[in-house]
């Protein structure tokens, strides 16, 4: 919690049993109040690993709803738990949880209502296991979108986001 604002990290999971523990253990619980994991009908033991880590809010989809459906479940549960700040963190460790402090304080201090982080800077995506073809495709799409929209973002399609409940 920062300035009496409840912070919830949501983990949209699919076959994340091998990387979930590493991701979870780096979440800064000095400010994070709760964690929600939504298992999108994984074929591995993602839910069991989440349970063994002590994650209190585990939702398992009976059928795979895809990334968008998983996100909706994550955000709806966080709002149901009265989150003031919701941070989406993928449990595949392509995003470092170490940015949660900065993202949270940026919103808690009222600077922005939305913070979008990048896994591309510093080659974090490749170090985190992103396949090279996906990395190249992501870079190409981002370059194209930057040119079309006259922007300078490092990654348009990031899944590492923080939102104020206002948005």
Q: Where is each model-derived feature located?
A:
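A short, conserved beta-strand element in the Rossmann-like catalytic core
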Residues: 41, 66, 94
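Acceptor/aglycone-binding surface of glycosyltransferases and processive sugar-polymer synthases
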Residues: 61-63, 67-80, 97-167
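Short beta-strand-to-loop acidic/aromatic patch adjacent to the donor-nucleotide binding site
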Residues: 83-94
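A conserved acidic beta->alpha catalytic loop
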Residues: 39-47
């Amino acid at each position: 919690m920062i300035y009496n604002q409840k912070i919830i990290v949501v983990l949209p999971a699919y076959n994340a049993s091998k990387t979930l523990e590493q991701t979870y253990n780096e979440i800064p619980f000095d400010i994070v109040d709760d964690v929600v994991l939504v298992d999108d009908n994984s074929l591995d033991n993602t839910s069991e690993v989440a349970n063994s880590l002590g994650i209190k809010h585990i939702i398992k989809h009976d059928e795979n709803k895809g990334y968008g459906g998983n996100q909706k479940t994550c955000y709806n549960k966080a709002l149901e738990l009265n989150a003031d700040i919701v941070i989406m963190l993928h449990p595949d460790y392509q995003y470092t949880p170490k940015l949660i402090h900065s993202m949270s304080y940026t919103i808690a201090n009222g600077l922005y209502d939305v913070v979008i982080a990048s896994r591309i800077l510093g080659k974090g995506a490749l170090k985190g296991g992103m396949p090279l073809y996906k990395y190249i495709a992501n870079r190409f799409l981002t370059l194209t979108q930057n040119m079309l929209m006259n922007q300078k973002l490092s990654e348009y399609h990031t899944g590492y986001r923080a939102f104020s409940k206002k948005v």
